[in-house]
Amino acid sequence: MIEFKNISKSYGNQEVIKDFNLTIECGTFLTIIGSSGSGKTTILKMINGLIKADKGEVLINDKNIQDEDLIELRRKIGYVIQGNILFPHLTVFDNIAYVLNLKKYDKKEIEKIVNEKMDMLNLSRDLKDRLPDELSGGQQQRVGIARALAASPDIILMDEPFGAVDAITRYQLQKDLKELHKKTEATIVFITHDITEALKLGTKVLVLDKGEIQQHDIPKKICSNPKNEFVKQLLKMAEM
């Protein structure tokens, strides 16, 4: 379980998160959507300690992350961002195995896990020895997700991971990710600018504006009972 308790964060004189409180239950697929500058990425990066709150606490399984070894914490959390974030000098195999090597996994176990994740993400094993620049955009994103899943994390953070791929590839990645969530039961926190994507993927959807929660509910209830004008305007975009 991830908990934000009375979180505030400012950059200079601009407060981007204001007295923010949220609980994300284990196994939730939470999609976060909102206006630019609404604090989406700030909230995401607070979970793995890349950004520290000015006030309040972030807890994972009842433990304040600031009391934890943050490097070790990040190795336990999968992280996927938009675009090519693979190590350009490493092969597909070595990119996926990166955290496993850091954790000193046995070579045979690494081989087994890499094969499993490649199969899970519909990546041909023939790609193992290729470098990232020899892959399509969709293949690169799949490798990034496979790497995030390699050490079987309980939490996966995704910051607009499908924003740089074409519509057909995006559709297939969305479908694959929904299936992955069912299989792994990991807690996924997923940022998007696309309300249709947010409603399609999330078991819960969080709508933000100016650092404040506008609505947090299951997709069906957000569609049937939008809480305010901001949420209504977002839903109109889904109808276009």
Regions found by a protein language model. Give the residues of each.
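Conserved catalytic motifs of ABC-family nucleotide-binding domains
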Residues: 152
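Conserved ABC ATPase "signature" region
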Residues: 108-126, 179
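ABC ATPase "signature
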Residues: 216-217, 225
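ABC ATPase NBD coupling module
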Residues: 64-78, 83, 102, 222-226
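Conserved ABC ATPase signature
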Residues: 131-135, 139
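Helix-to-loop junction immediately C-terminal to a conserved catalytic motif
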Residues: 48
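Conserved ABC ATPase "signature" C-loop
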Residues: 210-211
